[in-house]
Amino acid sequence: RDIIKIKNSFDGINIKLMKCGSIEEALKMVTLAKKYNLKIMLGCMVETSVGITAAASISSIVDKVDLDGNLLINNDPFEGVKVVNGKLSLPNANGLGLKLISKNDSLV
């Protein structure tokens, strides 16, 4: 657990869902960071709306959010979380609410 190692050296952590591996692992990291009074930022890499929407699903429990990686690609075959008036807006559907909008063979 890197959080335990750095808890006295830093004021906060940046969780990237694609690097920690799962929503479940991210939630464990959030719990541990809160235990040590660390600030929590939820970040991302350049990725499709699948990863961004998954990360956005836990955004309400962190201090800061930077989830714009899907806005940096022009061939995202999915529709998920959107930015509305500067705030994340999750889809109103079951699960993550993702919608396949195009089958892009270049992503396979």
Where are these regions (language model features)?
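Catalytic core of soluble alpha/beta enzymes
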Residues: 1-54, 59, 74-86
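Short helix/strand-capping turn motifs
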Residues: 64-66
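Beta-strand->loop->alpha-helix junctions that form or flank phosphate-binding loops
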Residues: 68-73
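C-terminal extensions of enzymes
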Residues: 77-108
